């Protein structure tokens, strides 16, 4: 009985449960999953202004880029109980010392945070397809001597 909604300002398709207002999707959904590229438009999509719209006890998943979500705000939301949990395979300032990262510290303390490496697409099948594609590309374009 799960209902799936989505927000994309660039897609207009009546087949889907599209919500046209980003803050409305924050209010409506129990699980928010972000799958966007990083741009000026998507930088800190979750921020100090719109965190209040998020459904209490929501779970947030970010598999995009770390900068999509303002980590400072997420850390505060998890600590206060506003957000029930956060899962990500990316963090802001990914090249900084993770020992000083408050989000990493929440995970270490068992505060409903999961952080994994950004390699979900690196399955055996995906890697094999890349190998085949690249081999065919090099052979077809005479790039192998």
Predicted regions and their residues:
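Rossmann-like dinucleotide/phosphate-binding beta-alpha-beta segment
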Residues: 1-56
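Rossmann-like dinucleotide-binding domain for NAD(H)/NADP(H)
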Residues: 57, 64-145
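Short beta-strands and strand-loop turn motifs
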Residues: 6-9, 33-35, 62, 88, ...
């Amino acid at each position: 009985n799960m209902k799936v909604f989505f927000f994309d300002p660039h897609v207009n398709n009546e087949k889907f449960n599209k919500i046209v207002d980003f803050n409305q999707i924050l209010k409506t959904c129990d699980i928010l999953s972000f799958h966007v590229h990083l741009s000026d438009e998507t930088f800190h999509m979750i921020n100090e202004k719109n965190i209040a719209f998020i459904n209490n006890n929501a779970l947030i998943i970010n598999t995009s880029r770390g900068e999509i979500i303002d980590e400072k705000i997420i850390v505060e939301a998890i600590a206060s109980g506003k957000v029930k949990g956060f899962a990500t395979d990316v963090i802001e300032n990914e090249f900084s010392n993770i020992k000083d990262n408050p989000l990493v510290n929440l995970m270490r303390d068992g505060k409903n945070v999961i952080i994994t490496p950004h390699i979900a697409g690196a399955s055996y099948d995906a890697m094999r397809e890349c190998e085949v594609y690249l081999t065919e590309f090099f052979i077809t374009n005479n790039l192998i001597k």
